[in-house]
């Protein structure tokens, strides 16, 4: 599916005019890359937001301006920390038959057996680097964790891989694991502490008895 975004060329205008454009719901940006000279642009912020919301950050976006159609990926962006409004977006023009490396979201699916047994699922890696042609970049990669028991874990090597893309990240990178319930861990540590304390007390009593015998 082609995601079309209508944009207009813009001049490098005074800050006051850029502020006015933002108040009108316009976002500023720049497009550069394959067969494209760096060109400042302006577009409706909501149009881009809808594309990225529906198709993910790696969506292939076809920019339309001055009769041109340019296939691009979002290469970087700046957002307002309070409103999340896109203040500036970098679009990278891409060659459709050439692979590029991007980060894809890792989404865990399924209810882990270990969680049903009282454990909890902890995820440490949320994105993985993949290489693919622009049209084949995955929106996300799902990993089924339903068979994970307490103490089990998954790494990048466990991610499903399709012919349309290649996973570039190191295969031994840890993604998630099912850990023991915190209460049980604390109880075991408490029991270990009690055992050590009892052993220490026993050794102390034996030392005292030995001293008394000598006297």
Swiss-Prot record:
Q: Which InterPro entries match?
A: Rbsml_bL25/Gln-tRNA_synth_N, Ribosomal_bL25/Gln-tRNA_synth, Ribosomal_bL25_b-dom, Ribosomal_bL25_C, Ribosomal_bL25_long, Ribosomal_L25_dom, Ribosomal_uL5_bac-type
GO CC terms for this protein? cytosolic large ribosomal subunit
Q: Where is the composition biased (Acidic residues)?
A: 183-215
What's an example Gene Ontology biological process for this entry? translation
Ordered alphabetically, the record's keywords are:
Ribonucleoprotein, Ribosomal protein, RNA-binding, rRNA-binding
What residue spans carry the region label Disordered? 171-215
Q: Which GO terms describe its molecular function?
A: 5S rRNA binding; structural constituent of ribosome
| Pfam families, A to Z | Ribosomal_L25p, Ribosomal_TL5_C
Q: How does it assemble?
A: Part of the 50S ribosomal subunit; part of the 5S rRNA/L5/L18/L25 subcomplex. Contacts the 5S rRNA. Binds to the 5S rRNA independently of L5 and L18.
Identify its protein family. Belongs to the bacterial ribosomal protein bL25 family. CTC subfamily.
State the PANTHER family in the record: RIBOSOMAL PROTEIN L25/GLN-TRNA SYNTHETASE, ANTI-CODON-BINDING DOMAIN-CONTAINING PROTEIN, RIBOSOMAL PROTEIN L25_GLN-TRNA SYNTHETASE, ANTI-CODON-BINDING DOMAIN-CONTAINING PROTEIN
Name the job this protein performs.
This is one of the proteins that binds to the 5S RNA in the ribosome where it forms part of the central protuberance.
Q: What is this protein called?
A: Large ribosomal subunit protein bL25
């Amino acid at each position: 599916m082609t995601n079309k975004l209508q944009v207009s060329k813009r001049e490098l205008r005074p800050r006051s005019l850029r502020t006015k454009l933002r108040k009108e719901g316009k976002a500023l940006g720049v497009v550069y890359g394959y067969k494209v000279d760096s060109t400042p642009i302006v577009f409706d912020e909501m149009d881009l937001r809808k594309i990225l919301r529906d198709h993910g950050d790696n969506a292939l976006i076809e920019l339309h301006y001055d009769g041109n159609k340019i296939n691009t990926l979002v290469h970087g962006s700046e957002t307002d920390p309070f409103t999340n409004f896109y203040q500036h977006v970098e679009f990278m023009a891409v060659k459709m038959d050439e692979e590029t490396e991007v980060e894809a979201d890792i989404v865990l699916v399924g209810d882990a057996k270990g969680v049903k047994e009282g454990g909890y699922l902890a995820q440490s890696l949320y994105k993985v680097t993949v290489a693919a042609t622009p049209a084949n970049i995955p929106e996300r990669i799902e990993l089924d964790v339903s068979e994970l028991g307490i103490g089990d874990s998954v790494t990048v090597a466990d991610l499903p891989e399709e012919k349309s893309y290649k996973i570039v990240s190191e295969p031994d990178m840890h993604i998630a694991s099912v850990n023991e319930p915190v209460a049980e861990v604390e109880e075991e540590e408490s029991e270990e502490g009690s055992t050590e304390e009892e052993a220490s007390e026993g050794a102390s009593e034996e030392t005292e008895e030995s001293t008394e015998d000598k006297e």
